């Protein structure tokens, strides 16, 4: 973690104080949580968009905590899950998806995740035909990925020590 020890200690003390003083409201908290959860649409699917040879969309399910990204070739019935947040998050204490970007030729996926809670995202590049990571991960980015039109590179930004996007890089 990037927290200073005195900040961490203060936050832990505040959390303990809150826990102690809110103990009597545990049942109310559970009921409120259930009510709010009941209003959330757990099964959802985005609109499909057409791009080159595929149509792309995303969906969430009751069973999962994270979004699945899907695609289907025009004229075919087979649906391909090209990125599954629940699979990616498995075994991690923290997981946040940054960006999911398929190359213009539909062959390569660049995506970013934060698995530490630091809000620094790591970018991975995956071959969609075999699912293998094909590049070294790019560390401490802002998370956004934009493919160049020629599919030979993409753009991303790095964060400075104050967590501000500082420079744009082409990879």
Label each PLM-derived region with a short phrase.
Residues 1-171:
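Beta-propeller folds
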């Amino acid at each position: 973690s990037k927290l200073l020890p005195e900040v961490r200690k203060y936050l832990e003390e505040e959390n303990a104080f809150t826990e102690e003083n809110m103990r009597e409201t545990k049942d109310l908290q559970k009921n409120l949580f259930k009510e709010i959860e009941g209003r959330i649409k757990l099964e959802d699917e985005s609109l499909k968009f057409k791009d080159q040879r595929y149509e792309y969309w995303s969906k969430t399910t009751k069973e999962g905590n994270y979004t699945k990204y899907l695609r289907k070739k025009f004229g075919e019935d087979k649906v391909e899950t090209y990125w599954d947040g629940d699979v990616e998050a498995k075994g991690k204490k923290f997981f946040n998806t940054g960006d999911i970007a398929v190359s213009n030729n539909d062959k390569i996926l660049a995506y970013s995740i934060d698995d530490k809670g630091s809000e620094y995202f790591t970018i991975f590049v995956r071959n969609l035909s075999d699912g293998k990571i094909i590049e070294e991960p790019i560390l401490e980015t802002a998370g956004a990925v934009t493919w160049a039109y020629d599919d030979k590179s993409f753009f991303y930004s790095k964060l400075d020590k104050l967590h501000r996007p500082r420079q744009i890089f082409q990879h």
